[in-house]
A protein has these predicted regions:
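Conserved beta-strand/short-helix segments
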Residues: 1-279
Length: 279
């Protein structure tokens, strides 16, 4: 569990082991990892996966506020002992420049179909608060770059859309390979857009060449503010769910897109739409 505002936004992450008895207090967690310094917001995002291909599940943590919001991502290997501070992480990856918010979002999945789980990090403020946004893919190839600019793949947003604010991975075309989904909730006057990048051997480097683009219903909806994936109709295939927190004066909406061979390009034609209770 992340607590990014702990101790003047230094941030903390808490691990609770599934040992038959979960503690009711964060202070009694099995492992507590502290951020590096105030303002880092360590714990702003979390993901898990086997990031060094040793058969054990590791932890990735974002700290979007690190160094004037340049941002950092940390990987902690499951090697028998977790450090007490982020500064002692096994891998540290630093964003490109101030106010990029690198580490605001993290997801994981095998994005080059080599059988190993890769790390994906979003920086919705890139470049330096202009907020076009970028998404960085780091392949699990035995050596992670320490700088975001040296990622294996970089996908760039446009038009101050805050691309990379939310990320999720899942097989959304039922071909047996994990695909990448990223949002730009501020697109087109905060209407919002969600982009699907299929794992077909070549991931594009700009949102303009995404395999599927889904656009929100109207301005100021923030479509894509949140993303998740799962089998929501029990057909054995992974579907996509998208949140739009500001729909109808912050009433909010959630949209489900079934993995049925054709994902629509507009939120209004989602397979399921769930509307919040009140403004």
């Amino acid at each position: 569990v992340g607590a990014q505002d702990y101790a003047s936004t230094t941030g903390r992450v808490y691990l609770f082991y599934n040992d038959g008895s979960l503690t009711p207090s964060a202070a009694s967690a099995d492992v507590i990892i502290m951020g590096e310094t105030t303002g880092n917001s360590f714990g702003s995002s979390l993901a898990s996966g086997d990031f060094n291909a040793d058969g054990r599940i590791d932890l990735a943590v974002g700290a979007l506020g690190y160094s004037s919001s340049t941002g950092r991502a940390y990987i902690f290997y499951q090697d028998g002992s977790y450090p007490a501070t982020a500064a002692s992480a096994d891998i540290t990856i630093t964003g490109e420049t101030t106010i990029d918010f690198f580490g605001a979002s993290i997801t994981s999945g095998d994005l080059n179909a080599d059988g190993k789980v890769d790390v994906v990090v979003g920086a919705f403020g890139w470049p330096s608060s202009a907020s076009d946004g970028q998404v960085y893919i780091f392949y699990n190839d035995g050596s992670y770059a320490s700088a975001a600019a040296s990622a294996d793949v970089i996908i760039t947003g446009s038009g101050a859309q805050s691309f990379g604010f939310s990320l999720v991975a899942g097989d959304l075309n039922a071909d047996g390979r994990v695909d990448l989904i990223a949002s730009g909730y501020a697109s087109s006057g905060n209407t919002g857009k969600v982009y699907l990048f299929y794992n077909d051997g070549s991931i594009p480097t700009t949102v303009a060449t995404a395999d599927v683009t889904i656009t929100g219903e109207t301005t100021s909806n923030h479509f894509g503010y949140s993303l998740t994936a799962g089998d929501f109709n029990a057909d054995g295939k992974i579907d996509l769910a998208v949140g739009a927190q500001r729909y109808s004066t912050y009433t909010g909406r959630a949209y489900i897109f079934y993995n049925d061979g054709s994902i629509p390009t507009t939120a209004a034609t989602a397979d399921v739409i769930i509307t919040g209770e009140t403004t």
